[in-house]
């Protein structure tokens, strides 16, 4: 499956040129934002860890081995890219135990930067945001046009697509999810099951968002929509008055789309018709998600880009810095600006 099939159309027009992302790990830096005051005491040891070209799950296994505890005793808030330089929190459950020597887990790809005790473990999804520093190299685009486009994105946000990372190489996770859905079965392995359910659900959301980008309604509230604030999981229906709420214009409040699961969508009017039409194209997948116990949830259609700044360290390098809510993808910001090409191959798209 192509990127266009997995995501959907761009909202800002054609890309302004090409660039390379992730030529080296330092070109894609992620810092987890966690707004939890740590007490300094308790049976959970929280670790602030820097990883280079190492995925979150492998880092967790290495930390658990070094601490001499089962991997189920280690927790993290979210998964981070492997091909990147990332800093994120982990927690180890160590009731009645002293702080372990974690030096055996450390090498060029993993460093423990800080250790703090706390009363509770780190919960999945506990982080509020991720801060990104991206260096786009081999840049072939006009700086003035880039500045204009980036100012536009700063003011308007971008479609909140799930990035291609969610779907595996060539959309392989979506293909697998569709096959399992057709058989009305679930993989036995928990991590495989979770990955495929997530991919199938994300694919359906992107299909809905693609339709609203195509008709221009992705950033505009309409009667029947369900609205949500940027950092809230709750939502409320939009009538005429809600569609005129000034918080929509300042990117605090947004229309939402469905994360398919058990139960009907509470949306109304044209919004409900479109959501039902998208679901009707993949009935087996929708039923599979519901039968797997997934609840119907909502995700904002528009992604506000917090604190977006940029500069050009060299004429052919664009450096971007910004903050995104947890669960959102930096690459969907970049695709609204330039086409990404792989290092050493300037004529073929890069898949992350």
UniProtKB/Swiss-Prot annotation:
<dbReference type="InterPro" id="IPR020103">
    <property type="entry name" value="PsdUridine_synth_cat_dom_sf"/>
</dbReference>
<dbReference type="InterPro" id="IPR042214">
    <property type="entry name" value="TruD_catalytic"/>
</dbReference>
<dbReference type="InterPro" id="IPR011760">
    <property type="entry name" value="PsdUridine_synth_TruD_insert"/>
</dbReference>
<dbReference type="InterPro" id="IPR020119">
    <property type="entry name" value="PsdUridine_synth_TruD_CS"/>
</dbReference>
<feature type="domain" description="TRUD">
    <location>
        <begin position="157"/>
        <end position="303"/>
    </location>
</feature>
<comment type="similarity">
    <text>Belongs to the pseudouridine synthase TruD family.</text>
</comment>
<keyword id="KW-0413">Isomerase</keyword>
<protein>
    <recommendedName>
        <fullName>tRNA pseudouridine synthase D</fullName>
        <ecNumber>5.4.99.27</ecNumber>
    </recommendedName>
</protein>
<dbReference type="InterPro" id="IPR050170">
    <property type="entry name" value="TruD_pseudoU_synthase"/>
</dbReference>
<dbReference type="GO" id="GO:0160150">
    <property type="term" value="F:tRNA pseudouridine(13) synthase activity"/>
</dbReference>
<dbReference type="InterPro" id="IPR043165">
    <property type="entry name" value="TruD_insert_sf"/>
</dbReference>
<keyword id="KW-0819">tRNA processing</keyword>
<comment type="function">
    <text>Responsible for synthesis of pseudouridine from uracil-13 in transfer RNAs.</text>
</comment>
<dbReference type="Pfam" id="PF01142">
    <property type="entry name" value="TruD"/>
</dbReference>
<feature type="active site" description="Nucleophile">
    <location>
        <position position="81"/>
    </location>
</feature>
<dbReference type="InterPro" id="IPR001656">
    <property type="entry name" value="PsdUridine_synth_TruD"/>
</dbReference>
<dbReference type="GO" id="GO:0005829">
    <property type="term" value="C:cytosol"/>
</dbReference>
<dbReference type="GO" id="GO:0031119">
    <property type="term" value="P:tRNA pseudouridine synthesis"/>
</dbReference>
<dbReference type="GO" id="GO:0003723">
    <property type="term" value="F:RNA binding"/>
</dbReference>
């Amino acid at each position: 499956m192509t990127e266009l099939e997995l995501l959907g159309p761009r909202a800002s027009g054609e890309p302004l040129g090409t660039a390379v992302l992730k030529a080296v790990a330092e070109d894609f830096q992620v810092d987890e934002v966690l707004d939890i005051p740590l007490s300094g005491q308790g049976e959970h040891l929280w670790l602030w860890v820097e990883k280079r070209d190492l995925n979150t799950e492998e880092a967790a296994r290495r930390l658990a081995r070094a601490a001499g505890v089962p991997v189920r005793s280690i927790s993290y808030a979210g998964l981070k890219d492997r091909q990147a330089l990332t800093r994120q929190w982990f927690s180890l459950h160590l009731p009645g135990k002293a702080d372990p020597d974690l030096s055996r887990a450390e090498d060029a790809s993993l460093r423990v930067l800080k250790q703090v005790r706390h009363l509770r473990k780190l919960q999945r999804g506990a982080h509020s945001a991720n801060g990104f520093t991206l260096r786009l190299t081999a840049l072939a685009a006009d700086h003035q046009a880039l500045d204009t486009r980036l100012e536009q994105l700063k003011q308007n946000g971008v479609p909140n697509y799930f990035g291609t990372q969610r779907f595996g190489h060539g959309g392989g996770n979506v293909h697998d999810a569709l096959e399992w859905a057709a058989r009305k079965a679930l993989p036995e392995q928990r991590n495989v099951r979770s990955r495929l359910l997530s991919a199938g659900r994300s694919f359906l959301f992107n299909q809905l968002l693609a339709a609203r980008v195509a008709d221009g309604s992705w950033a505009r509230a309409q009667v029947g929509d369900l609205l949500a604030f940027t950092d809230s999981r709750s939502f409320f229906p939009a009538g005429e008055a809600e569609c005129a709420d000034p918080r929509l214009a300042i990117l605090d409040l947004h229309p939402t789309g469905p994360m398919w699961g058990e139960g009907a969508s509470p949306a109304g009017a044209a919004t409900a018709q479109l959501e039902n039409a998208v679901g009707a194209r993949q009935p087996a997948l929708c039923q599979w998600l519901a039968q797997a116990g997934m609840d119907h949830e909502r995700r904002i259609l528009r992604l506000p880009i917090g604190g977006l700044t940029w500069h050009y360290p060299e004429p052919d390098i664009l450096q971007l810095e910004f903050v995104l809510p947890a669960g959102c993808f930096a690459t969907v910001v970049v695709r609204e600006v330039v086409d990404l090409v792989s290092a050493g191959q300037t004529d073929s798209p890069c898949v992350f």
